[in-house]
């Protein structure tokens, strides 16, 4: 009997102790990281969509044998810049200029480079064209054809392609970066 009483007392104390531990956990706080918030308020006719602000246009892979003369080009690859919340009463049109490192031999093209330590292709640059197929020099001052704005969302369409700057090309990475400037009138 005494053994049962001791066993039941020990069991009761264990339940009370377990409940006390479970009911009163000590909170722990630790720094988890940093979140960067970026944005901009603009006094303009439209706001550039966040999906258009930073984008990658994949031009593809081409054989060097495809470029046999200066001026040879690859297929045009479409891309667009989406404008949101447009108010055509503020400005009736929008145009875009691109700015980037110009090719040394053909300054109306973007110079190509490699993002890492890999070999950079030579004899080729990247050409950007507007919706009228007019080439846009990457000088930040050559604007695309004006597009009339409608209220709400507007899409400005462009294409890009590789263009030979020499009669012979060499293989390697052929990447370029360009920023774009909006002009509303």
Swiss-Prot record:
Keywords: Disulfide bond, Fimbrium, Signal. It comes from the Bacteria. GO terms for biological process: cell adhesion involved in single-species biofilm formation. InterPro entries: Adhesion_dom_fimbrial (IPR000259), Adhesion_dom_fimbrial_sf (IPR036937), Adhesion_dom_sf (IPR008966), Bact_Fimbrial_Adh_Pro (IPR050263). It is found in: Fimbrium. Its main location: other. Gene3D superfamilies: Fimbrial-type adhesion domain. One of its GO terms (cellular component) is pilus. Pfam families: Fimbrial. Disulfide bonds join 46-86. Residues 1-22 form the signal peptide. NCBIfam families: PRK15194.1. Belongs to the fimbrial protein family. This is Fimbrial subunit type 1.
């Amino acid at each position: 009997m005494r053994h049962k009483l001791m066993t039941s007392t020990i069991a009761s104390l264990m339940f009370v102790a377990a409940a006390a531990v479970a009911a009163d956990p000590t909170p722990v706080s630790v720094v988890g990281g940093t979140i960067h918030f970026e944005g901009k308020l603009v006094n303009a006719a439209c706001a550039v969509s966040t999906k258009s602000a930073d984008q990658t246009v994949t031009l593809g892979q081409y054989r060097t044998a495809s470029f046999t003369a200066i001026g040879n080009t690859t297929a045009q690859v479409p891309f667009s810049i989406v404008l949101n919340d447009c108010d055509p009463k503020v400005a009736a049109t929008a145009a875009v200029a691109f700015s980037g490192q110009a090719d040394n031999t053909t300054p109306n093209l973007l110079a190509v480079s490699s993002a890492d330590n890999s070999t950079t292709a030579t004899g080729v640059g990247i050409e950007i064209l507007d919706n009228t197929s007019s080439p846009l020099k990457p000088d930040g001052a050559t604007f695309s054809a004006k597009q009339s704005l409608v209220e709400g969302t507007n899409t400005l369409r462009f294409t890009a392609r590789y263009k030979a700057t020499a009669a012979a090309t060499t293989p390697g990475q052929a990447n370029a970066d360009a920023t774009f400037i909006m002009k509303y009138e």
